[in-house]
Amino acid sequence: MEIYSSPQQYLYNLETLSSAEAKRLWRRKIKQMWNYECAYCGAHSHLTIDHIVPRSKGGIDFTKNVVSCCYDCNQDKAHTPWEEWYFSQEFFSLNRYKKIKEWMKPDPPVNLFLYRPRRNNCT
């Protein structure tokens, strides 16, 4: 099963029939994509989901805006812009920083044509 862009996509694709279960499934898939470790410090315990751009600052519940995060990092970061907060941490890792930046990149546009469109030969 793939990871969808939001909990609502799990409902739309009939992976589940309740919004609560869709959100649980979405959160579980995000943690799985991060190998069940905190995106910031690498801890494996007390994992939560963190909005990279906090909802209070306009962040949304989309996969590209959330990462697997330990409880301590989530509480410490709070509403601080993530880069400002992360650069000030003693556990800062350039590799983890790059991985988060890569995660945040939008997906490439989907090619809607499954086959080459026909040319109109009428001239």
What do the PLM-derived regions correspond to, one by one?
Residues 74-91, 103-111:
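Low-complexity, flexible helical/coil segments
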Residues 39-68, 77-87:
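Histidine-centered nuclease catalytic patch
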Residues 22, 30, 78-81, 99:
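Acidic, low-complexity intrinsically disordered regions
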Residues 20-48, 70:
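Short cysteine-rich loop/turn motifs with clustered Cys
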Residues 1-24, 95-123:
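A boundary/linker detector
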Residues 17, 25-28, 53, 57, ...:
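A general structural-boundary detector
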Residues 8, 12-16, 30-31, 48, ...:
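A generic structural signal for ordered alpha-helices
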Residues 57-72, 89-104:
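Short microdomains enriched in Cys/His and/or Lys/Arg
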